[in-house]
Amino acid sequence: MLGLNSANKSPRIPDGFVLLRSELISVRKINRLLSRCNQDTHQPRKLELALKNSDFYLTLLQKTSENLVGFVRVTSDKGLNANLWDLIAEPGDQQEKYMSIVVFKAIEIIRRELPGCSISVAAPLISLNPLKANGFLLDPNGIKTMGFRR
């Protein structure tokens, strides 16, 4: 859940990188990054369908190599809730920075285009610091979430 007092400054995108919104991206690149982050990968067809049915997704790419270094996908019911999925960033010393870039931009878009929606995220532990830095609260007021996996 996102706190009300989260007016952070936009993290600077490093030189040589570009942040794109809903630009065609290979599901293989997303799965490769998920794997490098020790996250579950998705069946290519299901991931393609998820991208198609998302409200938007953000990709952070190195310009010269077109390597995917950050990703998040957003869905919403367009009324009450917006959800961040598959929040990942290239492992290494810049991982938190890359994550902060995609999280900040996702929040900015949600606030502008889906005002009033509460924002939730299912994310790995490594993302806790960037999420907190962008105003997320861990289990506010004792609220716990659950997920179902088949």
PLM regions with names:
Residues Q95-I109:
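Conserved acetyl-CoA-binding loop-helix of GNAT-fold acetyltransferases
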Residues V121-F136:
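Low-complexity, intrinsically disordered Gly/Pro/Thr-rich segments
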Residues K132-R150:
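Active-site/acyl-donor-binding loops of N-acyltransferases
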Residues L2-R45, G142-T145:
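Short amphipathic alpha-helix that is part of the acyltransferase structural core
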Residues I110-P124:
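Conserved GNAT acetyl-CoA-binding A-motif
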Residues H42-T64, L68-I88:
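A conserved beta-strand-loop-helix scaffold within acyl/acetyltransferase catalytic domains
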Residues L87-E96:
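A short, internal acetyl-CoA/4′-phosphopantetheine-binding micro-motif in the GNAT/acyltransferase core
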Residues E108-R111, F136:
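Beta-rich extracellular carbohydrate-active architectures
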